[in-house]
Amino acid sequence: GPSQDFMRF
């Protein structure tokens, strides 16, 4: 996914 995949919580 994108670089902001860590924002998925």
Curated annotation (Swiss-Prot):
The modification Phenylalanine amide is found at residue 9. It is found in: Secreted. GO terms for biological process: neuropeptide signaling pathway. Detected in the thoracic perisympathetic organs in larvae, and the dorsal ganglionic sheath in adults (at protein level). Its main location: secreted. Keywords: Amidation, Neuropeptide, Secreted. GO terms for cellular component: extracellular region. Changing residue 1 to A: In strain: Bangladesh. Belongs to the FARP (FMRFamide related peptide) family. This is FMRFamide-13.
